[in-house]
Amino acid sequence: MHQLTLAEIARGLADKKFSSEELTKVLLARITQLDPQLNSFISLTEELALEQAKAADVRRANGESGALLGAPIAHKDLFCTQGIRTSCGSKMLDNFKAPYDATVVSKLAAAGTVTLGKTNMDEFAMGSANESSWYGAVKNPWNLEHVPGGSSGGSAAAVAARLLPAATATDTGGSIRQPAAFTNLTGLKPTYGRVSRWGMIAYASSLDQGGPLARTAEDCAILLQGMAGFDPNDSTSIDEPVPDYAAGLNGSLQGLRIGVPKEYFGAGLDPRIADLIQNSIKELQKLGAVIKEISLPNMQHAIPAYYVIAPAEASSNLSRFDGVRFGHRCADPKNLEDLYKRSRGEGFGPEVQRRIMVGAYALSAGYYDAYYLKAQKIRRLVKNDFMAAFNEVDIILGPTTPNPAWKLGAKNSDPVAAYLEDVYTITANLAGLPGLSMPAGFVDGLPVGVQLLAPYFQEGRLLNVAHQYQLNTDWHTRTPTGF
């Protein structure tokens, strides 16, 4: 039962082959048995899950239907869940129980999903390895000595290990797509504004976007259907109709123009990954796609711009965690300043502190123009490069990551080395574009992803291309040994 995809679960529940309650019990037992090896969950919500599963079964018995009705999922632990700890992977929020549900959580609950728990993540979503979590590192089910990617590493590891069919995640600079690549999953970062950020604890407000992590493009389509849509509570949410993503998965790729940026294949890319990307290109050509070389000339400036903008926004967003209203508070503060300093010093881990300091520096009076303003100008240039490219092509294709998953601890002493692993993913966040990573093969037994980017609100196009690719390849069906 644990091998079933979301689409298969929907069919099984509709055909009364099993109930949501039966499935939920199987998966909860599996999580209890196997997750100690992975550390992919921060909180398990067994009582809530069984309650929701029973309610979903009653709804089905009363004639209701729906692809997500009775489907078990988990939420990345930065989506607020009413009455349940929402920690953001940080000591700062270890004692925080959200007083309300995030829009994503309430929308999916209304669609009938069953919440199995909250997944581990890099602290405040800052990281690409899921090693900065206060609850300990998450391990990659494909090789327990390697990282699963970050910051949505818990969601990725849990889905890859077949502990559940799909999970919610968020992407600020690649935090859905990079873990998807490292764990052989399909992960989609939607257009900025497609999925509500209300109740999603902010890292960098102009870059953060929630999306699905699953094993197939079809499952991503099903989960995105439940997450997407306008939300008046989120001022950055965009009132754009949500298409039927699953119904759009049958389009031919004949004549589809795929752009391959020459900048993607320079120094720094593992040549074995480059070969796998070429194989993916050949597969799509067989399906009728036309390949064109394009250029994204400002890509080289994207990482420095991102690592000014994201920490700058984080330093502002994280100023609310001061030990006063919620979150960690130091013991016996001498005065208000001592309360602030010690609460924040004790509550935030080293990577979060590093980014707050970088961000505060970039926003400071003497350096604002030199750093923050310049980074925003580069952001505009990156966006313009994509606009020009999409005048000529329908999709942009390249590697998701320059290297496969590294060993746990390998990049801890050199944060910049870890930052450089985001080189292919951050441009989509800077430009607000939708991006998808799908399985493309293996290097030394570790999964590799191929990334697709599309124009604004063309998530359906990405999902269709990925679905057609997955109908003709079997990388996405491979399972890690021992799970």
From Swiss-Prot:
Pfam families: Amidase
Cited InterPro entries: Amidase, Amidase_CS, Amidase_dom, AS_sf, GatA
GO process terms (BP): translation
GO molecular function: ATP binding; glutaminyl-tRNA synthase (glutamine-hydrolyzing) activity
Reactions performed catalytically: L-glutamyl-tRNA(Gln) + L-glutamine + ATP + H2O = L-glutaminyl-tRNA(Gln) + L-glutamate + ADP + phosphate + H(+)
SUPFAM superfamilies referenced in this protein's UniProt entry, alphabetically: Amidase signature (AS) enzymes
Coiled coil: none
Active site, UniProt feature: 76, 151, 175
GO CC annotation, single: glutamyl-tRNA(Gln) amidotransferase complex
E.C. number(s) listed in UniProt: 6.3.5.7
Taxonomic superkingdom: Bacteria
UniProt entry keywords in alphabetical sequence: ATP-binding, Ligase, Nucleotide-binding, Protein biosynthesis
NCBIfam families: gatA (TIGR00132)
Complex and partners: Heterotrimer of A, B and C subunits.
Function text: Allows the formation of correctly charged Gln-tRNA(Gln) through the transamidation of misacylated Glu-tRNA(Gln) in organisms which lack glutaminyl-tRNA synthetase. The reaction takes place in the presence of glutamine and ATP through an activated gamma-phospho-Glu-tRNA(Gln).
UniProt similarity note: Belongs to the amidase family. GatA subfamily.
Full protein name: Glutamyl-tRNA(Gln) amidotransferase subunit A
Record organism: Pseudomonas fluorescens (strain Pf0-1)
Name of the gene encoding the protein in the UniProt record: gatA
